[in-house]
Amino acid sequence: MSKYTVKRASVLCIFGIGLFVPATGTFACGLLLVLGFWVLFFSSLLARFLSQFFMRTRSAPLFEVCLTLSATIMYDNLIQGFFPLVRMMLCPYLFITALSRTLDLCLTAYDADAESLECVGVFGIMIAGISLVRELVAFGCVSLPAPSGFLRIISFPPSNVIRFAATGAGTLISCGIVLWIFRSAGNDHTPSLRSEW
């Protein structure tokens, strides 16, 4: 994989986090969202691996779409069975992710270099980190998914001064600051943002 592709994928990954800000208000939601994202990603890789050996090239994208959507539905049903209240918050975002992947497969030609495990790993870590920090700042606790809703494992009085940082607007602003720092730190090694695109 080229250095150009990895840098571009990393930047797009950071921008994409903004789409999931409403779903990362608690660590429990962020954790299940990251697991769903990985289920979607690896089901897509599995479909591509199987299609290389058992299917023709023209039918491979359709097989990948079907397996990806099936994996998303199975994961959604699994969450509904164990964590029904949390599932109500995450369901739209799980299927938005699956639909985005489906449109990507249907409307664009597949490029093997565009798939980056680094990007997927960074995306998952940042989603989990953002949800953890937001819940600590806003509610003064850390929660895990439970059948009755949320199980609090750490609790302390939240700070009213920095609570704004845990809201949707505050999180987007924080992501923008982190992205600016990320880009500024890389200026010594990369010519410019325009040159990477």
UniProtKB/Swiss-Prot annotation:
It is a multi-pass membrane protein. Keywords: Cell membrane, Membrane, Transmembrane, Transmembrane helix. The keyword Hydrolase does not apply. The keyword Cell membrane applies. GO terms for cellular component: plasma membrane. The chain crosses the membrane at residues 12-41, 78-100, 120-142, 162-184. It is found in: Cell membrane. This is Uncharacterized protein TP_0149. It comes from Treponema pallidum (strain Nichols).
